[in-house]
Amino acid sequence: MTLNCIGIRAEQNRRKWTMTSIMRLAAFIACVLSGGFLIGYLNVPGSWYAGLNKPWFNPPKWIFAPVWAVIYLLIALAGSRTWERHRHGIAMRLWLLQMALNFLWPPIFLSAHLPGFALTIILALFVVILASIARQWSSDRISSALFVPYAAWVGFASMLNLSIVHLN
């Protein structure tokens, strides 16, 4: 048996696509992407954010939408896989918790203008993402791998949030 780069046997990784699994995946993609776009639409950085002192590594505004679109797609793929394998388990509860924290951060930071409180939310999100990766690793490495870019981005966003708290 051959192993791929993240240690999954190719023979065990094959899956049979059914209409149910395709519809579930489509539902996860639709819900996560539409939720993310709605949160982004309702919490646009305005004059308050523009007036903040920001660190030198603050990315340009245009980068956030495409990065989050890709990350939300990865989150949806992982969510669909998790639902299929661990619908009532801890892994699915962690997935739901990370979605709640993910959707909570923008209104707290961008609309309520509470970067300190937002920092606690994003740090909790980061911990939950790491817990999700660890929890899924033994049973579904693909779901774990799908969360790695998400963890990297939220880690970066946490440093950005911390820097904004420190500089303001």
Indicate where each model-derived feature is located.
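Membrane-interfacial loop-to-transmembrane alpha-helix junctions, especially the N-terminal start
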Residues: R87-W95
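Membrane-interface helix termini and inter-helical loops of multi-pass transporters
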Residues: V44-N58, H166-L167
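Membrane-helix boundary connector in multi-pass membrane proteins
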Residues: F109-P115, A131-S144
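Membrane-interface helix caps and helix-loop-helix hairpins in membrane proteins
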Residues: P107-F117, I164-N168
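Membrane-interface loop-to-helix entry segments
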Residues: P59-L73, H113-L125
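N-terminal membrane topogenic signal
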Residues: R14-A30
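Alpha-helical transmembrane segments of multi-pass membrane proteins
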Residues: V32-S47
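Final/C-terminal transmembrane alpha-helix of multipass membrane proteins
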Residues: L146-V165
